[in-house]
Amino acid sequence: MKIYNHKVESFFASSPAAQFAKTLPGGKSGTLVAAIWAELGDAQGRWESSRHLQAEAGAVPVTKASGKSRVVHFRFACNKHLRYTMYWFSFVSLNHSEWAKLYYRGQRDNGHSHHQALRALGAKWLKIIFVMWRDHKPYDENYHLANIARQKMRQAA
């Protein structure tokens, strides 16, 4: 298994995407970030927006509405490998990212289960990863924290 992991890591390191993908929390070692990028592929027009990527990964629920009834439930039709990879990436990010830890704690405080909170965190990460993948830009924790602060200021105004 160690040999396999080493081969995956070395193959991914030679990829052009590795230079910015490895900037994700926990991306410097292991095969988790490589697995995410393998699922994303290199077809730039594959998803129109981060919302489409989130749906592909099963990170957002399905809403069925008819007349006065409205039901929201877990998304079963999705890329299971990407969903599983994002679930574990979200879990790992709790140890490497302060905002991720705070977001997860906020979800738990709102009554969500551990799994629901990780899926919600995965949806947040997919927005960030989509922009990184589309624009070939590295992840910058400080830039993301500044965006969060700007959004909170807009909501308060």
Spell out what each predicted region is.
Residues 1-157:
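A detector of single, family-specific signature residues
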